Structures are given as structure tokens and as C-alpha cells.
Amino acid sequence: HSNLNKLSNNEIIYKIKKANKSIQKNLNFNSDIFSYPYGESNLENEKIVKSLGFRIAFSQHSNHIYRGENIMRLPRFSFNEEFGKLDRFKMILESKALAVYDVIPKDTIINSSFIGMGFSTNHKLNSINCFHSNSVKLETFRIPPNRLEIRFLEPIKKGRNRIT
């Protein structure tokens, strides 16, 4: 499948409809559940997917689902050769969702150089640690009572970047 973030809206609609026709033909089944190719979505893609009749959609950021989650961008955990060890599976089973709100930036795909992000949560701020997937140095600010802001201390690289 193509990465939807690299396609025009018309191409996205065409590809999804084509895939649905293939599923219907081969499985005699219509699904109202969508999984973003490569696990990547943005606000515009989410609107398109919803307009095509999908009830929920899965992205690929790791978290448990919590009440109030964006149902067009639900998290899922990767399980494959690299991320499929039993110890990791046990850790996931024992962990809990980090419910967040007032997230900035609102979109998950950022096409410009930005210096940070933030969110609010009802969890204890001192129990939260943040890391960048490409070892970019960052600074975390805990703003009482429930706000966490992250600032990058060096430029982020082009391409896929994740904060965990």
C-alpha cells in the first residue's frame, strides 16, 4: 500500500475504494475498520477515511486505548520480528493508557521545522519520561498541575520521528 501522506486526496480516495472492492470481491466482506498504511495519518486523511464510511481507524503509535481517544486515530502496538519478544508483550499487558488532552500540535504529520510539543494529562507528571526515536536531545517541562511540554534542543531530522 502507498503511504497516504504522500498522495493527493483524490489518489487516497481512489486507492481506498480500490482496496475495498478487492476485499469485497475476494472475501465477500465490507469492513468499517481501517488501518493506515505504515501506521501514519494526519487530520486530512482522517476526514477522508471517515467520509468513506469507516467507523474507526488504527494508526501506529503505541498506547492503550482510553475513553475519549480519537476513534479515527486509535493506537496499536507493533508485533513483529523486532518488537515481538515475550518480555515486551508482558510489559504491554501490564501497562496502562496515558490519556492526554490539549495536545499540540494537533496534527501528527508536521511538514515544517518545529521545536516541540505538549499535552495535558491527569497522570502524575513526575512519573512521565519522554524520549525521541532518533536520540535528538530534548528538554521536558512539567507545568503544574497537569501540563507537560517538550522542547527539542537540536534540529530534528527529516523523515519519521517519534516521541515516546
Where do the model's predicted regions map?
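Terminal accessory/targeting
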Residues: 78-164
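Glycine-centered structural positions embedded in regular secondary structure
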Residues: 26, 57, 118-120
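A sequence-composition feature that detects small, non-aromatic residues
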Residues: 19-22, 57, 97-99, 136
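Beta->alpha turn/N-cap motifs
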Residues: 60-61
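Metal-dependent polysaccharide deacetylase catalytic core of the NodB/CE4 family, i.e.
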Residues: 1-45, 55, 68-75
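Glycine-enriched alpha-helix->loop->beta-strand junction motifs that scaffold or abut catalytic
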Residues: 50-56
